[in-house]
Amino acid sequence: MSERAKLQKKKKVTEDLLDSLLLLPPWRNFAISQSHQSIIESSSQRLPEKMRIDENEGVSASSKHLVFAYYVTGHGFGHATRVVEVVRHLIAAGHDVHVVTGAPDFVFTSEIQSPRLKIRKVLLDCGAVQADALTVDRLASLEKYVETAVVPRAEILETEVEWLHSIKADFVVSDVVPVACRAAADAGIRSVCVTNFSWDFIYAEYVMAAGYHHRSIVWQIAEDYSHCEFLIRLPGYCPMPAFRDVIDVPLVVRRLHKSRKEVRKELGIAEDVNVVILNFGGQPSGWNLKETSLPTGWLCLVCGASETLELPPNFIKLAKDAYTPDIIAASDCMLGKIGYGTVSEALSYKVPFVFVRRDYFNEEPFLRNMLEFYQCGVEMIRRDLLMGQWTPYLERAVSLKPCYEGGINGGEIAAHILQETAIGRHCASDKLSGARRLRDAIILGYQLQRVPGRDIAIPEWYSRAENELGQSAGSSPTVQANENNSLVESCIDDFDILQGDVQGLSDTCTFLKSLAMLDAIHDSEKSTEKKTVRERKAAGGLFNWEEEIFVARAPGRLDVMGGIADYSGSLVLQMPIREACHVAVQRNLPGKHRLWKHAQARQQAKGQVPTPVLQIVSYGSEISNRAPTFDMDLSDFMDGDEPISYEKARKFFAQDPAQKWAAYVAGTILVLMIELGVRFEDSISLLVSSAVPEGKGVSSSAAVEVASMSAIAAAHGLSIDPRDLAILCQKVENHIVGAPCGVMDQMTSSCGEANKLLAMICQPAEVVGLVEIPNHVRFWGIDSGIRHSVGGADYRSVRVGAYMGRKMIKSMASSILSPSASSANGGNPEELEDEGIDLLEAEASLDYLCNLSPHRYEARYADKLPDIMLGQTFIEEYADHDDPVTVIDQKRSYSVKAPARHPIYENFRVKTFKALLTSATSDEQLTALGGLLYQCHYSYSACGLGSDGTNRLVQLVQGMQHNKSNSEDGTLYGAKITGGGSGGTVCVVGRNSLRSSQQILEIQQRYKAATGYLPLIFEGSSPGAGKFGYLRIRRRISL
């Protein structure tokens, strides 16, 4: 073979290997970085004009000079610092790089001194707007993005296309500016993104809080990303479905300039002194640093401190130009907020990272999981950060043994891939525009867009956490009798059940089994296992196993009929579902309570004798991005001799959004104190384990509240009627959590019975009976995968609109009754008498919209209510809408007619539905029941509480119902969105038959094909908390 032929063959093999990068599976636990490295190393002897990477020399120069345009997001320094590493290698290879950024020049020029680096100070996105170092303002972030990138979009695209042509750019790189990808496509230049997250995923959460009218922002961002050729994905990544192809690389980390010894010598710090670096991204921290914050003998190096900030003697202010990677590597641990830069450097230099959560940033759970997997992370509660209670966290951090051994040359490898692509590799074959390529995607509860046919790449740890909570879509709806019996026997072996009965409930037996395993976890802290879920470790030390434990259970609910009409006084029909929340409670004398180390430090700092402390562990934190534990001194609930107000409690729990969930649990204690005069003298340990998935519209919050209050009441000998307990739990959600829900959720969870519908008139909470579900009728819930929240903007605005409508109706009725108004309008007393003065008087004092009949509404008020009204206009005319749990935003326009009309008609539909359930069995009966569900669904949509996912599910049910091949044996008859709407679960009614279940599974698969999400199916029922009672148990000590 000739020399030329040999070279050509080697070239072809190398090209095939490089091309295979695009086909590699999602990178897990960094193992794949070795595969990438071997491919790259195999190219080191390729043709001279091609690039190669040498272990010592980095990216070698190509004979083809290239011009790169590198766009950097405006969010923080972390993106800019990792871009430096990639740019440094590109410039070393002889290319020009134009960096488009809003970051200060020194971030780049301190590392790269080359005329080939060009910096253009332009900001084309805004990232997340932060109120301070730890708090993201979600609405402000969306508004700022609109102002920065949406309003001037046409001008931006025109300017960027012109600029790209002017610099003769060969290739565009984005980290991770959306519009840059579209600008590159318009300029006819190929582009690639380099990132660990994308802004469509981050903003999808903000849309939920700000309202779905902002949804177009997410769609546009995804469409922009879809124009790039592929994604170079960094470790700790989020799902990013808008990208066509993915190449995974190792960590991109800034190189070290000096050794630990050199840095400490320059700073005058001895080798044996423990050092923590305080690193919050250069943002002002806003708290007072105290000498007592550190353990004795420690020093703290402060990054980004203002010139005027006075520091205690054991704190050292670092120079503005201090090179942070060297300082981190020379420290014993780091204290800061999680971001890609801090996490990657902590892992690379094996420096334990004490982190404080940021609010509302979806990137964080993925980075946090990676940090904790490699034994490199300790979470600090925000309260302890601000109060200076750092010692237990720092001491815990230096006991860790970080074990990350993966690659840290991601910048080098990314530069290699970019150069290879720019000189002609991986040419794009798909010339369709991004908008035509993308399809709907539902990912981790958010509505996004995806490239069809590509794996969405949900991280394995997330799926595992879902399965552990019993929330897997593939989980079996029933437990076989023999399996159930073995579970019962097993839990009886583990515990003496001193009071109560498990009632054959398999989930209760499973919970008791998990309780029995906790003391094993506690005793095996020296376990050789690489990673134990943090919440399990915390739960392992929660209970004293020699003392009694009280267990309560409360199910979620399926909203069959009624929904949001509950706060307007409607009749509702609710079914308790199979999935439930379990809560275990134990009382302890304060002196004998096992306290977590930071709780001990807090009490010692106060210099007080042991006082009652509440400690809570909640399972499922990994999939809901919240802290797994919460603790407080119960004295914090007291103001002198009286309990604090609900308003103060709401502010107390809102201080740290990562721990706001505790309001649902701990709030039950304060309600008992305020409403029943209970005082708590003992410490309380409480474990929450809920299989009712959050954000699905099946009342996960009510199940937690009811189970928590039931268990606490049982442990303290309080006997509370189930109805009264439900009303108390509603106060938790309304007044302490601050969510404007009605009472039907808590009432169903507390008073419901298995396989029956709870019928209740919400005025405010009159249970009118239990309705037997006929044997031939069955209800299912199908989860749309879209997170739902009654605290969201859409639910709240619809409630405000309904109360506005009620106030207007009352005002109109009063006006008609007024003699002066009647004569002014040309009316006469006889006409008034014909209409019915009693009727008008009742409407003038209308307590609930549902007490107004549909025909009366249409005859007198429908054409007089406005479709929309500005909040300020309403307040000027009517003063207030008389709703104790919502506030009118004067600058916002509210829909009025649809939200007011909905409960009036819904109440009529529910009454009809209830009557139909007791009518003769027939297809007409089922058809009528289904028709009422459809009516309800479209009424929700008219109010603005629909969603693409729930609409799609209802359409799939309709298609199944009207499919000719199914018409002879019709099984599904109707479907509707449930609860607060805007996502969540769809309720389906059908014939109780095997064919119906098969059709439900078929809908599940069709939905997955359309959205990439396999929905949960809720079927079956279980008893409410009142019917279950409680268990009083004691651990059996094995001999």
UniProtKB/Swiss-Prot annotation:
The keyword Signal does not apply. It is an enzyme of class 2 (transferase). The keyword Aminoacyl-tRNA synthetase does not apply. GO terms for cellular component: cytosol; membrane; plasmodesma. Its EC number is 2.7.1.46. The record marks R557 as: Transition state stabilizer. It is found in: Membrane. It is a single-pass membrane protein. The chain crosses the membrane at residues 662-678. Disulfide bonds: none annotated. GO terms for molecular function: ATP binding; L-arabinokinase activity. ATP binds at P693, E694, G695, K696, G697, V698, S699, S700, S701, A702, A703. It catalyses: L-arabinose + ATP = beta-L-arabinose 1-phosphate + ADP + H(+). Pfam families: GalKase_gal_bdg, GHMP_kinases_N. GO terms for biological process: arabinose metabolic process. It comes from the Eukaryota. Belongs to the GHMP kinase family. This is L-arabinokinase.
